[in-house]
Amino acid sequence: MSFLYVCNTSSDNISKINLASFKEEIKIPLGMDKINKIGPHDLCVYNDMLLSANIYSSSLSFISLNEDKETENYFIGMHCNGVKVWQDNAYVICGETNSLFLFSLTKKKIIEEIPCGIFPHCISICEKNNLAVVANMHSESITLIDLSSKECIKNIKVQSYPTKAIFSEDGRYILVCESKMGLNKRGTLNIIDLKTLESLKRIEAGSCPVDIFLDGKYCFVSNFADGTLSIIDVNNRKEEKRIKIGGMPRGIVKSGKYIYAGDNYNNVLVQVDLIKESKKVITIGGEPTGMTLC
């Protein structure tokens, strides 16, 4: 059975969605003291645990996938935006410290800090090349990091307000979501060659693209400001289709013939059937943001 877990940032919980029935099974509450705001923002899976990077409590939560409850929580650094796991370490980016923190999942402590650009917003890892890439919103750059040496390889200048950067499945390219937030321009997907670190092509998406999900040759983009989803053919380097779903789509994933997008404005999860081009909607928590399949 497949599940989708969604961060509900303003309601301090995580929705567990049964994809077969497209129903919310449970909201998993975060905040072990039940007093302070948590703000879950990004998720990743580690063994039988779900890790949540929390922007308000500046912490990393451990959620048991078997028990559907938070079991541990550790302070990391101010404004934890994103988290990924590589070799028993959690790589957590903190927007207000402009840093990437390595948190040992065996020792349960921070073991290293790597500087990034200004206000890092997301992190992605390429296991094929032992690399990580961080999108820095306010310095309009991405930081490429060697995971083996734990050193910055290069800060690469990109266009305005990059919200996400990921690696292509073959490890040859970096795909950067350049949102151009607040500039009254359409955002772009920037394809960067990993060998030369030069831009090969910028493909226009919708207004203020904020998240991307890669499946084969297709990149699915959530356009926050115009309520649309872009489907981009990475190989042919063009936008093939744009689907109107309304609201303010934030996090996006694809499973089978469906795209799932969290509507940050209406507090709903939208399921789009790519074949029928129809949609279904269910209510979840407040301000859905990061999501992951499991």
Residue ranges and their predicted role:
Residues M1-C294:
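Predominantly soluble domains enriched in secretory-pathway, periplasmic, or organellar proteins
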